[in-house]
Amino acid sequence: MNIHTGEIQLVPYKEKYKEVIQTFTLPSEQVQFTSDPGELLEKAKSDRTKNVIVILDYNGVPVGLFALQTGDRVQEFTDNQDALLLTSFSINHNRQRKGYSKKSLALLQEFVLRYFPMKNEVVLAVNEKNIPAQNLYEKVGFQDQGFRRMGPIGQQIIMHLPIIK
């Protein structure tokens, strides 16, 4: 079952979306902060802990994607054994500035309750320099609880979204 607002929906990745996702581009200022969508699909093939989620527009066309990761890697970001790690969030460059990021993240609670009912939190790491992403995550309910870690290109803020059952 898909989670949707009428305008967008979140769905688990299927091969039928691959061709469109591989055409995604990102502006240069965003590339440093997230994974290339094609690379994410490749990594997820060999890593069963990376659950790729596709963001579809109202026509069912992929406009973005992200991963919800389970397993040991999550514990690098939180002590919560029942948390998921959100990684590799991106919206195709030519579909940005249309509200897809905010709308898709607003569906995250419902998606996690449906597909990961035993999980009670989503965590993510956002670079301190990536102010637009920090603001977006705060708007949809993620909280900065003061945890920091060093990432590949600098200090990262660990943000937490409690999943309310």
Residue spans for each PLM region:
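Conserved beta-strand-loop-alpha-helix junction that forms the acyl-donor binding cleft
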Residues: 118-134, 150-155, 162-163
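Conserved beta-strand segments that form the floor/walls of ligand-binding pockets within enzyme
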Residues: 85, 90, 123-125, 158
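Conserved acetyl-CoA pyrophosphate-binding loop and the N-cap/start of the following alpha-helix
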Residues: 95, 99-107
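Acetyl-CoA-dependent GNAT
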Residues: 3-7, 12-88, 92-94, 111, ...
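Solvent-exposed beta-strand sheet faces enriched in polar/charged residues
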Residues: 69, 123-125, 145
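Conserved active-site alpha-helix within GNAT-family acetyltransferase domains
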Residues: 102, 128-146
